[in-house]
Amino acid sequence: MKNKNKRLLVMAGGTGGHVFPGLAVAKQLQSEGWEIRWLGTADRMEADLVPKHGIEIDFIKVKGLRGQGLKKLIAAPFQILGAISQAKKHIKAWQPDVVLGMGGYVSGPGGIAAWLSGIPVVLHEQNAVAGLTNQWLSKIAKRVFQAFPGAFPNAEVVGNPVREDVCQLPHPKERFAQRTGPIRLLVMGGSQGARILNTTLPEALPQLSHEIEIWHQAGKGSQETVEQAYRDNGIADAKVTEFIDNVAEAYAWADLLVCRSGALTVSEVSAAGVGSIFIPFMHKDRQQALNADHLVQCGAAQMIEQQDLTVQGLVDTLNGLERKQLLEMACNARDAAIIDADVRVANAIKSLAK
């Protein structure tokens, strides 16, 4: 006899950009009485992260095809068929009502297995360029959602799930109301840092025509090097950290952000209401540049492509931003935010449950 509670199987893996949005939707449905289980791979971050959130996880063996040698490409169809078979066994054993694909290699075999088993599939694409797996699965999914316009021609734009403490920050008009003095510049290159930000910012800031207060997330293993770079350029009071544990606090502090434009970062800075200068990571499909483009078009951000980034160019960009414009950018960012992506996706899942 099937359990009376509705069940969702989440398929997501590989990176935080896939896993964290999946967890947000899972938590939303858990709060409404749903049972959640996860499908992932044993050698990626979901294997450790998902159980810490109290969700049981099953594993299948699957790897990406890009960059593989000829022998592995020849063997790939057999590996994919094996992964689909493994996923079907997990689905048959647990009998979910709906399957949610958030991207990563695991979503492909898992989504096909769900479709073959007659289980409705819901997709969410976090980036402005759809991943290969989601491109395939969009043809068999019952509902397809996208965080930014352009990933799919007719999919509903629902944003990315954003952590609650970021969504609850006061409006920029309230935060900026009494601010005077040096402009507060927050630099974030992700948990691994960004070498180009770590080298360019310390050179650029001493050349600015106005005072800057700096908080720089350097990434793992780079704190001392970046601190020394600031000192070498005459800035002794730069706040440099490996990581920022409380991102909401950092966004609330900042007048302006210089950062990469990963999908979750773009969604977070919009929800927080902070103007940004995006330096997209160079990728052949320009994924990060297209993620940033939505906020650039609505006046919430500026973008400098990595190949165009120079010390003098960054100096000129920063010198052109005064407090009035920073407030306008921050307000435009907040106006563009979609802060209920988890609820929207959860509602679609509920509508498909029999």
From Swiss-Prot:
The keyword Transferase applies. It catalyses: di-trans,octa-cis-undecaprenyl diphospho-N-acetyl-alpha-D-muramoyl-L-alanyl-D-glutamyl-meso-2,6-diaminopimeloyl-D-alanyl-D-alanine + UDP-N-acetyl-alpha-D-glucosamine = di-trans,octa-cis-undecaprenyl diphospho-[N-acetyl-alpha-D-glucosaminyl-(1->4)]-N-acetyl-alpha-D-muramoyl-L-alanyl-D-glutamyl-meso-2,6-diaminopimeloyl-D-alanyl-D-alanine + UDP + H(+). It is an enzyme of class 2 (transferase). GO terms for biological process: carbohydrate metabolic process; cell division; cell wall organization; lipid glycosylation; peptidoglycan biosynthetic process; regulation of cell shape. Gene3D superfamilies: Glycogen Phosphorylase B (3.40.50.2000). Keywords: Cell cycle, Cell division, Cell inner membrane, Cell membrane, Cell shape, Cell wall biogenesis/degradation, Glycosyltransferase, Membrane, Peptidoglycan synthesis, Transferase. GO terms for cellular component: plasma membrane. UDP-N-acetyl-alpha-D-glucosamine binds at residues 15-17, 127, 163, 191, 244, 263-268, 288. Pathway: Cell wall biogenesis; peptidoglycan biosynthesis. Its main location: membrane. SUPFAM superfamilies: UDP-Glycosyltransferase/glycogen phosphorylase. Disulfide bonds: none annotated. The keyword Glycoprotein does not apply. InterPro entries: GlcNAc_MurG (IPR006009), Glyco_trans_28_C (IPR007235), GlycoTrans_28_N (IPR004276). Its EC number is 2.4.1.227. It holds the Pfam family Glyco_tran_28_C. It is found in: Cell inner membrane. GO terms for molecular function: UDP-N-acetyl-D-glucosamine:N-acetylmuramoyl-L-alanyl-D-glutamyl-meso-2,6-diaminopimelyl-D-alanyl-D-alanine-diphosphoundecaprenol 4-beta-N-acetylglucosaminlytransferase activity; undecaprenyldiphospho-muramoylpentapeptide beta-N-acetylglucosaminyltransferase activity. It is a peripheral membrane protein. Cell wall formation. Catalyzes the transfer of a GlcNAc subunit on undecaprenyl-pyrophosphoryl-MurNAc-pentapeptide (lipid intermediate I) to form undecaprenyl-pyrophosphoryl-MurNAc-(pentapeptide)GlcNAc (lipid intermediate II). HAMAP family: MurG. Belongs to the glycosyltransferase 28 family. MurG subfamily. This is UDP-N-acetylglucosamine--N-acetylmuramyl-(pentapeptide) pyrophosphoryl-undecaprenol N-acetylglucosamine transferase. It comes from Aliivibrio fischeri (strain ATCC 700601 / ES114) (Vibrio fischeri). The gene is murG.
